[in-house]
């Protein structure tokens, strides 16, 4: 390639699109600590106290938490909720599958957010404050086998009674693809919700294989 095109050697690749690669012995790590610090600073959460979890069992989101009149909607207009969710989503898509469920829930209320939704968004940022040094780690191996897992709850959406499912695929000891999203159809049983989750995960696994 060097003989055909002009190529400039910039040395070993360490940083790209807010992703930092770290080599440790037989492992390669991907980190977004620098990006997370910028997000925390942007939303004035740089010195916030850390949270142990982005969301806890029993947390519920529904349309009743949204503003019911124009006055309350006007009060929420100055809150940078959509920007915060978008920033969290970029971290989630790149290196943080552990916040996929929470960010997915927050994204459902961008058009009419309530104070409770903003509190949870800040809670996710507090969680990132305490875990910003987390990395996706991949080990050198001759066995490049993709392993996938899927799961689903049942009728967790209070408004639509639809279930939320998720899947994750592992390669070389680290996550390479993941998703958490509300199902498009209403499952009538836990078994049906799990079957839908398994189908979606299998379809994505076939795509990864191809």
Q: What are the roles of these predicted feature ranges?
A:
Residues 1-210:
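Long, low-complexity, charge-biased intrinsically disordered regions
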């Amino acid at each position: 390639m060097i003989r055909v095109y002009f190529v400039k050697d910039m040395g070993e690749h360490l940083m790209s699109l807010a992703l930092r690669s770290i080599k440790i012995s037989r492992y390669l790590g991907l980190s977004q600590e620098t990006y997370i610090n910028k997000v925390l600073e942007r939303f004035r959460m740089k010195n916030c106290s850390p949270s142990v979890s982005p969301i806890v069992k029993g947390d519920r989101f529904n349309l009743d938490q949204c503003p019911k009149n124009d006055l309350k909607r006007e009060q929420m207009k100055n809150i940078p909720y959509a920007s915060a969710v978008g920033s969290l989503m970029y971290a989630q898509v790149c290196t943080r599958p552990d916040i996929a469920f929470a960010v997915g829930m927050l994204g459902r209320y961008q058009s009419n957010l309530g104070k409770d939704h903003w509190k949870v968004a800040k809670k996710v940022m507090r969680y990132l404050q305490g875990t910003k040094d987390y990395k996706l780690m991949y080990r050198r191996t001759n066995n490049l086998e993709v392993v996938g897992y899927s799961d689903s709850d049942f009728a967790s959406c209070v408004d639509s009674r639809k279930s939320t499912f998720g899947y994750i695929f592992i390669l070389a000891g680290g996550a390479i693809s993941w998703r958490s999203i509300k199902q498009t159809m209403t499952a009538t049983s836990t078994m049906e919700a799990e079957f839908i989750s398994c189908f979606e995960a299998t379809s994505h696994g076939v795509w990864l294989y191809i």
